[in-house]
Each structure stands twice: as C-alpha cells, then as structure tokens.
Amino acid sequence: MKALKIAALVVTGFFSLANAEEPVEPGFNEATFKGLEFRSIGPAFMSGRIADIAIDPTDPSVWYVAVGSGGVWKTENASTTWTPIFDDQGSYSIGCVTLDPNNPNTVWVGTGENVSGRHVGYGDGVYRSRDGGTTWENMGLEKSEHIGMIRVDPRDSNTIFVAAQGPLWSGGGDRGLFKSTDGGKNWRKVLGDGHGNTDLDDRY
C-alpha cells in the first residue's frame, strides 16, 4: 500500500511538472482587450448633416428633411416626432428634397449628397413619391451620383429640372442640368459640357 502511495505521488508530480512547463500559446485574452478602447476611425462624418428641407405649403406641420448620410425623414406634427421614409430605397445619401408646388403630396428626392468631400456617399438617381413618401419610384439619372437640386415647374408638373454634379473622382456619368417634360420618364441634358451642375435659379 505504501508503495502504491509513493507511485501515485510520483505520477502526480510528473503531470504537475509537465503542466507547469507547457508553453503559453499566443492569442487574445482578457488582458489584451483591457488595453483597447473603441474609437472612431472614419468616415469623417457619418450622419447629422441636413442637406435640404421641404415644407408642405398647404400644411406647415408637414416637413420633409433630406439628411446627407441618413435618408429622408418626415414629420406631420412640426418636428415633435419623425419617421424615416426612405430606408428601403437604394441610397442612404441624399442631396435634396422637393415638393411639387401643384401637388405637395408628390415628393421628389435627389440622391447623393452634393458635397465634394472624402466623407460623402453617392446616390443612384432621382426618386419620386406620389403618396407623401409611402412608396417610391426611381425616375432615372442613376449615374448622376450627386444631385444638388430638383425643381418642378409651377405652371406644369410634368416639367422638372435636375442639377446633377456627377461622379466626384472620375469623368462620365450623368452630370449637368437635365430637363424632363413628361414627368420624369425621359431626361434631356440642357446644360453642361462635361461639367457638373450643383444649383439652379428657378425664378423664371
């Protein structure tokens, strides 16, 4: 019995020594992560920039707000509460929002914030809603990437002008001033020989 106890002690000591000599495998552990803190590494600005605001002329409690990197938001109680109305569409970056002066329930949105900066996102054209932002339809100019302004002719809702900047870091694309006379079904460039257009004066 005494011999068995001695043998057991020897075996236990052998395994203890073996475990003590096992090298520690490299890897992440709690001490590693304690030295790290979350920090912003970009883009420069992720949201919060208001690109445009449109207010219903027939109901001043209804506003539409285009956010540079946050879609389109709507309030029906003069900003007490807000609802995102563009989240299911193809672009989160918005350059402008415009209401049809003849029917403010028709909303036009130009995607792609109109800012020349490394933080900016690009869009995929012009969108239209005929029901106050519930549903949307892409109306073209998908290669414009950055739209600064949309204006609807108050004398004819089928006539729309779009100021498109085009791609920031390359040539081509849909850039310039575009006009539609059929409600956005077709577009014709009326200004811009290879140059983008960011604004227009609609006092005509």
Q: What is each residue range found by the language model?
A:
Residues M1-K2:
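N-terminal secretory signal peptides that target proteins for export/translocation
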Residues K5-S16:
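Bacterial N-terminal signal peptides
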Residues E21-Y204:
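Beta-propeller blade termini and top-face loops
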